[in-house]
Amino acid sequence: MPNKNMTNKLKYILYQFLTGTVGNFLVFLQPKKARRLAENRITLVHKNKKNLSVSERLMRAALVKKLDKIDDYNQIAELNRGFWINNATELFVETEDGFETDFLPNCTFIFDLLKDELGDQRAAFSTLVEIGTGNGDVLNYLSSEFPEVNRFVGIDLSPKQIELNKSKFNDNKKLEFVAADAFDWVTEHGHSNTIFVTSRGVLEYFLEERLQDFFKEIYRLGKSVFIAIEPNGGGHNFETSPHSQLYGNEPSFSHNYPRLFKNAGFTIWHFSQKPWLGGYDKQTFVGAKSF
């Protein structure tokens, strides 16, 4: 029997074939709908397929394949940053079911491992910071999983989303939401005895050099733990290609997270990967600590 990775790869190849034939034909037949689907590059890439019909899914995939290739890393970083500041709220609405369909069944195990890793030191960590908090659901969940932590800070580039989160979670007094650049916030407000978290696609928008500097800045704070749940390109082999690569259609960056954490001084206590949302790319789980 073929293994799971081979099955996923075959599904991926079949899907690419269908989008290249049926999808392109539908785009030709329905140009107005195609223009509506393609209004924003990143929204097009991430659009929640559950809200689309089968024909719209094939059209979307065909349009994604037609996107102009971008090779300038600085341009990519700026385009993505601009999107997350100005247009992220609409995308969070599109993908809000991800907390129930992806995070809860596929990602919560690493926080159980974190509890075991911290052991009797759990009480020493007074603050948990989620970088790229999005709609705040993950931060709210973590506040119930780590009752000994007094302060939960959610940082996001989108001022509009932060205001929505403040209203949505007004009853949870442990939560704070801040519209800021994560690097700037950590430099000004970061301190020791902090757990840092990213969930399902945040660090992928950092340039490699900036991400390395960010990890070093956190390491300098003192005692800290970092949980990174981040996507990687399906073909990114960290041993043969140790540096960051472009992946996906936004595109964003597939980083060698273990290498970057180690270079900053952290110890890796957990590393694992699994297929991301049943596709060819991988979801990577890293637990790192500075002590």
Protein language model features and the residues they cover:
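Class I (Rossmann-like) S-adenosyl-L-methionine-dependent methyltransferase catalytic domain
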Residues: 2-189, 209-213, 217, 225-291
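Short acidic/histidine-rich motifs immediately flanking catalytic phosphotransfer sites
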Residues: 193
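A conserved beta-strand element that flanks and buttresses the S-adenosyl-L-methionine
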Residues: 197-198
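Hydrophobic adenine-recognition pocket in adenosine-nucleotide-binding enzymes
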Residues: 202
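Mobile active-site "lid"/loop adjacent to the S-adenosyl-L-methionine
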Residues: 222
